[in-house]
Regions:
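FIC/Doc superfamily catalytic core
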Residues: 1-373
């Protein structure tokens, strides 16, 4: 059955970047988004060990950004995989493909952040490297990782067999990407405006056969950090996009259909504001839990190693019991005693019982209950 093209919207040739935008038109939304983002960033700067907040937020972002594209994994699955991960992502008959793809999202984003920190510029080779890492394994491995499309692609409603959007043609893609990266390098637009336009333009170019949405959302975090709006590359926006998926897609389509850059920018600024507030709320909840349990652990564990245990659990809330013994910075006999006591007190739940030489898989439920999505 062929796809229906009657309602298809085509790429906006010759209209990027828009030339008639007035920042005054977006000033209230821009100020609100900037303020919310600054509050979140300031809180992270004020916490000595902010990894206890960032690790759960990173996992949420990977799960939700992948979920927008139809890759369904859970926080528990991701963290269980990480508990057995020795630094290499490997395909396994014991692990669902969706989990592998979500883990690869995390790795690609982390490596991209490091590349930018090392002085690598936003460029064609940069996004190709990101894409190659994103689609290294799983279903994407058969979709030309690191290579641009050579045939016309399109976005479609597969149930109704309707084409919704036709991205830029392969023949024009090189010029489109050059134009985008020149804009990123030279534009004097406000950072949030630049980020909004970069994201929607990348989505409209749709340069790869698969993984475009995930790469496009990574660019948001990377740009906000690289352009100086964030002190660290740790702002994750996919939660809002996933919750408002139809509005997100429609706002992007209207850019090409009606040249409606303004509507897209307003949607994006609202997304940043609301997601920053939500991230701040989650981080505050995690910090409050940490402070509460600091007192409880000191009182109930009666051990000089209680803070070591707490920091480990917040950083690795799902783990094999032997990793706690090896990596919490606690002498092995004391670690074994603390682990047993934490289970007895109900802080740790056994997700998998020990079997042979394989240690038990444990979950730090007070934190997991806050961050599951």
């Amino acid at each position: 059955m062929e796809y229906n093209l009657n309602n298809a919207i085509s790429y906006h040739y010759g209209k990027f970047p828009p030339t008639n935008l007035q920042i005054s038109d977006f000033l209230p939304e821009l100020l609100a988004a900037t303020d919310a983002l600054a509050r979140f960033d300031q809180m992270l700067k004020n916490i000595p060990n902010n990894e206890i907040l960032l690790a759960p937020l990173r996992n949420q972002e990977a799960v939700l950004s992948s979920r927008i594209e139809g890759t369904l994994s859970t926080m528990d699955e991701i963290m269980a995989y990480q508990a057995d991960d020795e630094g290499q992502v490997k395909a396994s008959s014991q692990v669902r493909t969706d989990v592998i793809e979500t883990i690869l999202y995390q790795r690609a984003l982390k490596n991209a952040q490091q590349a930018l920190a090392d002085g690598y510029p936003f460029s064609i080779s940069f996004i190709k490297q990101m894409h190659q890492q994103l689609l290294f394994l799983g279903r994407g491995a058969s979709k030309s990782p690191g290579k641009f499309k050579e045939e016309q692609n399109f976005l479609a409603d597969k149930i109704r067999k309707e084409v919704l959007f036709i991205p830029i043609s392969p023949e024009k893609l090189g010029d489109g990407l050059d134009n985008l990266f020149q804009y990123i390098e030279k534009s004097k637009d406000a950072v949030l405006i630049k980020t909004a336009l970069t994201h929607v333009e990348f989505e409209a170019l749709h340069p790869f056969n698969d993984g475009n949405g995930r790469i496009g959302r990574m660019l948001i975090t990377l740009l906000l950090w690289k352009e100086g709006l964030l002190s660290q590359p740790h702002f994750y926006i996919s939660g809002y996009f996933e919750e408002h998926r139809e509005e997100y897609i429609q706002a992007m389509r209207l850019v090409s259909k009606e040249n409606s850059w303004e509507q897209w920018i307003r949607f994006f600024l609202k997304a940043v504001e609301e997601q920053a507030k939500n991230n701040l709320s989650i981080a505050e909840s995690i910090r409050s839990l940490y402070e509460k349990l600091k007192l409880e652990f000191a009182a109930k564990l009666s051990s000089k190693w209680s803070m070591n245990a707490l920091d480990f659990l917040f950083t690795y809330p799902v783990f094999r019991n032997n990793k706690f013994t090896q990596n919490a910075g606690i002498p092995a006999p004391s670690a074994a005693t603390l682990s047993k006591k934490l289970i007895e007190l109900g802080y740790l739940a056994e997700k998998e019982a020990a079997s042979g030489s394989r240690p038990a898989l444990l979950s730090f439920e007070p934190l997991m209950e806050l961050v599951r999505v």
